[in-house]
C-alpha cells in the first residue's frame, strides 16, 4: 500500500521553463552576457539555480562571483514573474486529488529555492494538503543527496522500515538518483525537461507518459 508520494516540482508538477528562461535571460542581459533559448535553458534545470547560472554563463565567466550576481538579479525578477507562463502539466491536479481522496500523503522535494517552491505550490494547488513542501535551503545538500527525502519522511511520520510504501516521482536523472540514494521506488515521467533515455539509465521501477499511469500504479499497490 502506498502511504506517501513525493513529487519533484519543475518538469514534474509544473511546466516552469518559460518563466525560468525569462528570468535567467533578464539577469544575463543585465550584465551583458549572451542569452539562451528556453529549449537550451531547459537542459540547464535540475540541480538548483546556482548550477543553472553556472551552465548559462559563457566559458571563462563561470566564477562563483558571477553566479552570485546573476542569482541576485534573477530572484526578484522571478519572484515577480514566476507565474507568467507557468502551469500544471495535464492531469496533475486530478492526480493530486486522486491521492488526497485515498488519504495518501503528498510532499514536494525540489532543488528550486525555498521561497519560490512554496509560492508556486500555494498558488497552483491551494486545495491540496501537503505534508511537506521543501526546496533548496542554505546549509542543506541539494538533490540527488537524500537529505530532503529523509526530512520529508520525518514530516510525514513514516519510518525507514516503510520505504516500500513510498513513491518518488520526477522528470530527470537527478530525481532518479535521489530515489536510489533514498532507497525508495522511483517513477520517471516523460513530460518534463529530460528525455526518456536519461531516465532509463537509472532503471527506475516505472517510466510513464501520463498521470493516469501513476494512478494505475497506486491502485495496483492496495
PLM features per residue range, with description:
Residues 7-9, 74, 149:
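Conserved hydrophobic/aromatic "anchor" residues
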Residues 1-3, 39, 100, 114, ...:
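Asp-based, Mg2+/Mn2+-dependent phosphohydrolase catalytic module
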Residues 29-34, 59-65, 102, 125-129, ...:
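Short helix-capping segments at alpha-helix termini
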Residues 1-43:
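Active-site neighborhood of HAD-like aspartate-dependent phosphohydrolases
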Residues 22, 30-60, 76, 90:
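Alpha-helical substrate-recognition element adjacent to the catalytic core
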Residues 55-94, 102:
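Metal-dependent phosphoesterase signature
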Residues 20-21, 46-50, 67, 71, ...:
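A general structural signal for well-ordered alpha-helical segments in protein cores
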Amino acid at each position: 500500500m502506498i502511504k506517501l508520494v513525493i513529487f519533484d516540482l519543475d518538469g514534474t508538477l509544473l511546466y516552469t521553463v518559460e518563466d525560468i528562461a525569462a528570468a535567467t535571460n533578464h539577469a544575463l542581459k543585465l550584465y551583458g552576457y549572451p542569452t539562451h533559448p528556453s529549449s537550451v535553458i531547459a537542459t540547464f534545470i535540475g540541480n538548483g539555480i546556482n548550477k543553472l547560472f553556472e551552465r548559462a554563463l559563457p566559458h571563462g565567466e563561470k566564477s562563483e562571483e558571477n553566479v552570485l550576481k546573476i542569482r541576485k538579479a534573477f530572484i526578484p525578477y522571478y519572484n515577480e514573474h514566476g507565474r507568467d507562463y507557468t502551469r500544471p502539466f495535464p492531469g496533475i491536479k486530478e492526480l493530486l486529488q486522486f491521492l488526497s481522496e485515498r488519504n495518501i500523503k503528498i510532499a514536494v522535494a525540489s532543488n528550486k529555492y525555498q521561497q519560490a517552491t512554496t509560492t508556486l505550490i500555494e498558488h497552483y494547488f491551494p486545495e491540496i494538503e501537503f505534508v511537506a513542501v521543501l526546496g533548496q535551503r542554505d546549509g542543506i545538500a541539494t538533490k540527488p543527496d537524500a537529505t530532503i527525502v529523509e526530512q520529508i519522511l520525518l514530516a510525514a511520520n513514516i519510518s525507514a522500515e516503510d520505504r516500500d510504501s513510498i513513491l518518488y516521482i520526477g522528470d530527470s536523472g537527478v530525481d532518479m538518483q535521489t530515489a536510489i540514494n533514498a532507497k525508495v521506488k522511483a517513477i520517471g515521467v516523460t513530460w518534463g525537461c529530460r528525455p526518456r533515455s536519461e531516465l532509463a539509465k537509472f532503471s527506475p521501477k516505472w517510466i510513464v507518459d501520463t498521470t493516469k499511469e501513476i494512478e494505475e500504479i497506486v491502485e495496483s499497490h492496495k
